[in-house]
């Protein structure tokens, strides 16, 4: 007898994955140059030269240790490098103990959800959203509550969130820049959201956690992307280098439990426990050390900006109405 829920997930893979697989078949049939695949988020920009150089140097310098285990939360030197980067960039008191290296943002999200919820809790997601959120929420034994974004600007709908947040709410997942529409939450919008959370915490007598899904943070076109922990301290940031360094297949990222929250150490301990329970041994070791060497490497968004300009101009000329993507 197999697990019915897991069988269902395996029997009906995500539409994104199905389209990606179909695209691979068509590329083999008619040539990759004739297939425009908008399904999965594979970057079209190669990884920076600094990444290749780091890999080559590491293969020469650390052959014996490079493929061994690290602590579950990651190499302490790499956690320190990530914490230093967060502190420099966002002016927050980031400590390495609050950084947990992960196999991409997906692992960080699954761990974070399990760390701050109990079975029967509710987790709010903002529509439109990445479909796998619902899978990870369900796996934690929680109910998924969908709240549509405000249309047409796709900002957080504060009134709708006020109605949705209730006694069972444990966490809200934010994704800015948003996948799939590319909207970026403004500082004003996030501040209104934080004020709502403060009121709701007092009203409900429970802590409300924000899980900020940030794989597209670097892929923006001039828009400010406020750092969520600076607006709402009770935030876990899930970051990935899949887009910023064009490394989706290497599965490397981190989650950062904001030092600004009053229960940061408790949450970090729960994160470690959730990682253990979900079977995450450690993030890929070679690329832990690669990101430490490439932590300040800038993202090349020129090709994405050109694609955006081409598509938005063409669609506008055809009479389509849309929100111009600010990122992703």
Question: What is each residue range found by the language model?
Answer:
Residues 2-104, 111, 294-301:
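N-terminal small-domain helix-loop-helix segment of the aminotransferase-like
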Residues 25-31, 89-91, 196-208, 259-265:
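Alpha-helix termini
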Residues 35-37, 238, 321-326:
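Short beta-strand
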Residues 57-61, 257-262, 283-303:
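Amphipathic alpha-helix from the class-I
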Residues 63-202, 217-232, 236:
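Conserved core of the PLP fold type I
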Residues 227-267:
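Active-site PLP attachment segment
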Residues 245-249, 264-289:
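Active-site region of PLP-dependent enzymes
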Residues 285-292, 304-316, 322-328:
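Conserved glycine-rich beta-strand-loop-beta hairpin in the small C-terminal domain of fold type I
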């Amino acid at each position: 007898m197999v697990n019915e829920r897991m069988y269902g997930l395996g029997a009906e893979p995500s539409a994104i994955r199905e389209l990606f697989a179909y695209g691979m078949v068509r590329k083999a049939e008619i040539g990759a140059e004739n297939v425009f695949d908008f399904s999965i988020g594979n970057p079209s920009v190669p990884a920076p030269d600094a990444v290749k150089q780091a890999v080559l140097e590491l293969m020469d310098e650390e052959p014996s240790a490079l493929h061994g285990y690290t602590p579950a939360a990651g190499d302490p030197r790499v956690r320190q490098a990530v914490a230093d980067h967060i502190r420099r960039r966002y002016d927050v008191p980031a400590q390495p103990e609050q950084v947990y290296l992960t196999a991409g943002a997906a692992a960080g999200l699954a761990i974070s959800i399990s760390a701050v919820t109990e079975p029967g809790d509710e987790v709010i997601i903002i529509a439109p959203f990445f479909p796998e959120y619902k899978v990870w929420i369900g796996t934690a034994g929680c109910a998924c509550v969908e709240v549509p974004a405000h249309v047409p600007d796709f900002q957080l709908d504060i009134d709708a969130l006020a109605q949705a947040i209730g006694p069972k709410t444990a966490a809200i997942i934010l994704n800015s820049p948003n996948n799939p529409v590319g909207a970026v939450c403004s500082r004003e919008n996030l501040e209104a959201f934080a004020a709502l959370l403060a009121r709701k915490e007092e009203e409900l007598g429970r802590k409300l956690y924000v899980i900020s899904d940030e794989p597209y943070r670097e892929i923006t076109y001039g828009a400010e992307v406020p750092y969520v922990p600076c607006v709402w301290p009770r935030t876990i940031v899930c970051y990935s280098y899949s887009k910023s360094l064009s490394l989706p297949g290497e599965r490397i990222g981190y989650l950062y439990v904001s030092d600004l929250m009053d229960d940061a150490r408790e949450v970090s301990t729960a994160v470690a426990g959730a990682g253990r329970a979900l079977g995450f041994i450690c993030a890929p070791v070679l690329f832990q050390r690669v990101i430490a060497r490439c932590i300040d490497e800038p993202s090349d968004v020129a090709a994405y900006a050109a694609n955006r300009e081409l598509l938005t101009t063409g669609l506008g000329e055809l009479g389509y109405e849309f929100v111009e993507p600010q990122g992703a």
